[in-house]
């Protein structure tokens, strides 16, 4: 596992279950909306294999979260996305595994040809028929809010923050966060490696 950047890491992220929580892995998810549908993938390998989700993956050194979102979408679907907006920060406090921090983006502009890859089988899904039973348990909590925000054409709402508590992949509890400031800038590149503080 690649450690995260010290220069961008908040000293303390407070969650209801850990006062000094720090993510070990940071990643992105992208939901491309087009003509009343959203692009989803069936994950064929790696973390979340067999589950349905948006394209996404781990944030790498020297790229911004926006660049990560674009790269992962291209790698997993063959589509180049543009005009991404960050809609949410998700904090996954895991009692029996790695700690994840996720950033959810929405795009409405894309180019290219939809292509299945070794990592993912992409498909379009009606916005009113999302297969939550084949997704992570938390997706049904935050994804409807993301999609609703993304379809508002007037003023853009601030990204929301939500905490989730898991034990070995089982969702135990969740809580929205009143703050709207994200823990990381979505436009700043990830810098030097960071050794996680205990």
Q: What is the role of each PLM region?
A:
Residues 148-160:
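Short helix-capping/linker segments at secondary-structure and domain boundaries
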């Amino acid at each position: 596992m690649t450690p995260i950047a010290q220069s961008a890491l908040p000293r303390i992220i407070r969650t209801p279950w850990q006062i000094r929580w720090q993510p070990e892995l940071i990643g992105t998810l992208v939901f491309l909306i087009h003509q009343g549908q959203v692009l989803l993938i069936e994950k064929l390998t790696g973390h979340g294999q067999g589950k349905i989700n948006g394209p996404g993956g781990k944030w790498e050194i020297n790229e911004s979260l926006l660049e990560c979102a674009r790269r992962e979408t291209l790698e997993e679907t063959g589509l180049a996305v543009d005009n991404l907006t960050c809609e949410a920060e998700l904090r996954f406090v895991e009692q029996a595994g790695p700690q994840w921090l996720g950033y959810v983006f929405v795009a409405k502009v894309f180019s290219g040809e939809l292509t299945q890859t070794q990592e993912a089988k992409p498909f379009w899904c009606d916005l009113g028929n999302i297969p939550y039973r084949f997704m992570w348990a938390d997706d049904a909590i935050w994804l409807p809010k993301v999609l609703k925000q993304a379809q508002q054409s007037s003023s853009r709402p601030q990204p929301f923050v939500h905490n989730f508590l898991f034990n070995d992949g089982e969702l135990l509890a969740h809580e929205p966060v009143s703050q709207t400031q994200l823990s990381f800038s979505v436009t700043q590149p990830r810098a030097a490696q960071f050794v996680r503080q205990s």
